Amino acid sequence: MLKTRSIGLNVAGVPLLNNISISCPKGSVTALMGPNGAGKTSLLRVISGEYKASQGTVDINGRGANDWARPEIAKFMAVLPQSSTLDFAFTAEEVVALSRTPHNTGLSRDLEIISSALSMVDASYLSDRSFVKLSGGEKQRVHLARVLAQIWEHCENQSSDGGILLLDEPSASFDLAHQIMLIEIVQKISTAGVTVIMVMHDLNLAAKCADQLVFMNSGECTAMGTVPELLTSEMIRKVYSVNAEVGLHPVDGTPLIII
């Protein structure tokens, strides 16, 4: 369970977030959505601890985020930012291995987890290749494997306390096949009890994998609810100033946005 209570954020005197309160139950998938500059990434950074809120609190499993020791939270929460710069000629396997630093599980177990995480993101064949020579989509998949490996114990088992995965536009550089892969991964780990919070722009992709949506604009939460409640023509027009038709997907019945 993750909750934000009346979060406000000011950076260099500029207000970025105002009175944001959301609740994300254990094992849920929440999509943060809205136009560019709405505050989605800023909220994710406050939740992760990268930014310190100017007001309000973040509670994780009933404890204030500041009450978690860094080694403890590193085993429980992983963050995939929009972009990650890495200029060292590590192999893909070595990049994923960085995420096991907080753990004390031994080399044999860590190598097993690294291999499983790379396999999950369809990147086993990249294991020995230089990370800096990979394509953008390949790099993103390796980084996805890295954050999965960081909280692998929570992804693998139905643990009592879950785990949290924060993803900032994770599908931005993925082709269609790997967008589908991402949906399947999110569904699998959330079933295991991991709470997933994602910044997303693709409404149809969000409809496939999210349990709840949080629409943001100008640093405020304008609406929070389930996919059927919020993915309506009226809401899309209100949030994005775009006229769209919303039907039902012929296979799974999820909302289907047609521009």
Residue ranges and their predicted role:
Residues 2, 17-19:
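Conserved structural motif at the start of ABC-family nucleotide-binding domains
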Residues 33-35:
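The feature captures the beta-strand-to-loop junction immediately N-terminal to the Walker
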Residues 64-78, 88:
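ABC ATPase NBD coupling module
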Residues 233, 238-259:
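ABC ATPase nucleotide-binding domains
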Residues 56-64:
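Conserved ABC transporter NBD signature motif
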